[in-house]
Swiss-Prot record:
Its EC number is 2.2.1.6. Pfam families: TPP_enzyme_C, TPP_enzyme_M, TPP_enzyme_N. It comes from Brassica napus (Rape). It is found in: Plastid, Chloroplast. This is Acetolactate synthase 2, chloroplastic. GO terms for molecular function: acetolactate synthase activity; flavin adenine dinucleotide binding; magnesium ion binding; thiamine pyrophosphate binding. Mg(2+) binds at D513, N540. The lineage of its organism: Eukaryota, Viridiplantae, Streptophyta, Embryophyta, Tracheophyta.
Length: 637
């Protein structure tokens, strides 16, 4: 008999589930009516769909208003129509006193669906999951005061990771601003440094222009979050909207990057032809240029190391050219390549401290070429020998064209063989503990059973790093994780947003028990919306990364890293199966390695949401590890 416990009924599935016996009685769970299908049909990797969406926005020939041209309507209705005109068809909005007018207007929309999160932070993380997986801006709405404050982590996360996001907040009426009125917070001031831009709407006539500007800012150049704060009396005020108002962004428009000069691209290619040990160091800025990057690698034969945010921009399973992830928890061979390279091609990256370690020692033998769309990133942390401020996609297209016309013979086979020797000498590996389940093995199995094609979200901690190491992403926008901010609680709501943006896709939240419980309330949203989100819970009853750092840097002195019940430390606490059951979601627990494959297959075969609680040992560490501020010579394997 399979030794994993199961709670909940498994709905009938067109795909035959693995047969197993239930060692516990089955709890009958309530059935929920199926919600209307999402209108979003954007594939995680479909540029054509994204282009169609972009062309649909602001197009009078395709947009039809339900209002006659000269009919006054409320500011809230103008706001909702402005969203419709931008192609928005789903928002994540939680109502409150200062935003109820907007919610009432949403009920009058024929095209926008609201997904009601159970917490505003869940809503903004869901909007991020939607945006990260589709490339379209995610939209979230919250009320004033505490509702707006609950968006702060999500705004900072979107800014760090360059995610296009529009956050709309209700505000107290204009006459009450600055009086410490009930549920008043100065959200514009609070979020000024964690948004790309923000607005306080003081005139109803400005709504069409502000919304248009917000979408342009959120999606152009380096994407990011924009906040629009709308006082309640502005929402209630009636006006005839002017949809032809021009944007007022003269300074921003004057700094837009220009196409790269051919002479600059030829200079880079001369450096490539002169080098013996070149390495591509690619980041999140390459997610929209995956095809061009692959072609560049075909033409040059240069090996590719990816940042945490760039995973999937080049296929991780291409063992001839992919070095997988570099940095603090990157592979030995990726970090070796950077250490001994003579040319570092840094495309769409920001030389983050988790990649570079000690800046002076990073790529110290190499000439550095930095291409990025954001001029403020060039030279900020590491001074390049050659830099080009432009869209990476345009730069790659230009270099590919030059290479195809020249037909130069570039041979870096000897260098790749040297790196392959490092791969064989220092592969990603992990310990086994008898019948216990290594978390890395669980992720490897998931990769195998999904053929590396699932959309993966994570929380933050050890499980996040293991997912980055052991799941082999094939395409961009498969990997959704809080990178720069490192916000726990991200995984579950992000999976919710990804499932809505990508109907039919397999979406799995690989989470840790610490991160998962921070937004566990979104299980209710997932069930009510009937979203097929799978949760692979790596449950070691600890804050694993904190415990690991305690072991390495604090003489293993334990300080609040245990999450279980001190009175009964051997028990699994809290019981995640009961949380799932309370929301009507099937769930199972697996404790033995030999049962894991069947358990994961059952999770994948079960229609709708499913939670698989994988009980793991807590003693393992994420390796390799380059300590913070360290160098390649300090790597722990």
């Amino acid at each position: 008999m399979a030794s994993f416990s199961f709670f909940g009924t498994i709905p009938s599935s067109p795909t035959k589930a693995s047969v197993f016996s239930l060692p516990v009685s089955v709890t009958t769970l309530p059935s929920f009516p199926r919600r209307r299908a999402t209108r979003v049909s954007v594939s995680a990797n479909s540029k054509k769909d994204q282009d169609r969406t972009a062309s649909r926005r602001e197009n009078p020939s395709t947009f039809s208003s339900k209002y006659a041209p000269n009919v006054p309507r409320s500011g809230a209705d103008i706001l909702v129509e402005a969203l419709e005109r931008q192609g928005v068809d789903v928002v994540f909005a939680y109502p409150g006193g200062a935003s109820m007018e907007i919610h009432q207007a949403l009920t009058r929309s024929n095209t926008i669906r609201n997904v009601l999160p159970r917490h505003e932070q869940g809503g903004i993380f869901a909007a991020e999951g939607y945006a990260r997986s589709s490339g379209k801006p995610g939209i979230c709405i919250a009320t004033s005061g505490p509702g707006a404050m609950n968006l702060v982590s999500g705004l900072a996360d979107a800014l760090f990771d360059s995610v296009p996001l529009i956050a709309i907040t209700g505000q107290v009426p204009r006459r009450m601003i600055g009086t410490m009125a009930f549920q008043e917070t100065p959200v514009v001031e609070v979020t000024r440094t964690i948004t790309k831009h923000n607005y306080l709407v003081m005139e109803v006539d400005d709504i069409p222009r502000i919304v248009r500007e917000a979408f342009f800012l959120a999606t152009s150049v380096r994407p990011g979050p924009v906040l629009i704060d709308v006082p309640k009396d502005v929402q209630q005020q009636f006006a005839i909207p002017n949809w032809e108002q021009p944007m007022r962004l003269p300074l921003y428009m004057s700094t837009m990057p220009k196409p790269p000069k051919v002479s600059h691209l030829e200079q880079i290619l001369r450096l490539v032809s002169e080098s013996k040990r070149p390495v591509l160091y690619v980041g999140g800025g390459c997610l929209n240029s995956s095809e061009e990057l692959r072609r560049f690698v075909e033409l040059t034969g240069i090996p590719v190391a990816s940042t945490f945010m760039g995973l999937g921009s080049y296929p991780c399973d291409d063992e001839e050219f992919s070095l997988q992830m570099l940095g603090m928890h990157g592979t030995v061979y990726a970090n070796y390549a950077v250490e001994y390279s003579d040319l570092l091609l840094a495309f769409g990256v920001r030389f983050d401290d988790r990649v570079t370690g000690k800046l002076e020692a990073f790529a110290s033998r190499a000439k550095i070429v930095h291409i990025d769309i954001d001029s403020t990133e060039i030279g900020k942390n590491k001074t390049p020998h050659v830099s080009v401020c432009c869209d990476v996609q345009l730069a790659l297209q230009g270099m590919n064209e030059v290479l195809e016309n020249r037909r130069d013979v570039l041979d870096f086979g000897e260098w790749r063989c040297e790196l392959n020797e490092q791969r064989l000498k220092f592969p990603l590996r992990y310990k086994t503990f008898g019948e216990e389940i290594p978390p890395q093995y669980a992720i490897q199995l998931l990769d195998e059973l999904t053929d590396g094609k699932a959309i993966i979200t994570t929380g933050v901690g050890q499980h996040q790093m293991w997912a980055a190491q052991f799941y082999r992403f094939k395409k961009p926008r498969q990997w959704l994780s809080s990178g720069g901010l490192g916000a726990m609680g991200f995984g579950l709501p992000a999976a919710m947003g990804a499932a809505i943006a990508n109907p039919g896709a397999v979406v799995v939240d690989i989470d840790g028990d610490g991160s998962f419980i921070m937004n566990i309330q979104e299980l209710a949203t997932i069930r009510v919306e009937n979203l097929p989100v799978k949760v692979l819970l790596i449950n070691n009853q600890h804050l694993g990364m904190v415990l690991q750092w305690e072991d390495h840097f604090y003489a293993a002195n334990r300080a609040d890293s245990f999450l279980g019940d001190p009175a009964n430390p051997e028990a699994v606490f809290p019981d995640m199966l009961l949380f799932a059951a309370s929301c009507g979601i099937p769930a199972a627990r697996v404790t033995r390695r030999e049962d894991l494959r069947e358990a994961i297959q059952t999770m994948l075969d079960t229609p709708g949401p499913f939670l698989l609680d994988v009980v793991c040992p807590h003693q393992d560490h994420v390796l390799p590890l380059i300590p913070s501020g360290g160098t390649f010579k300090d790597i722990i394997v």
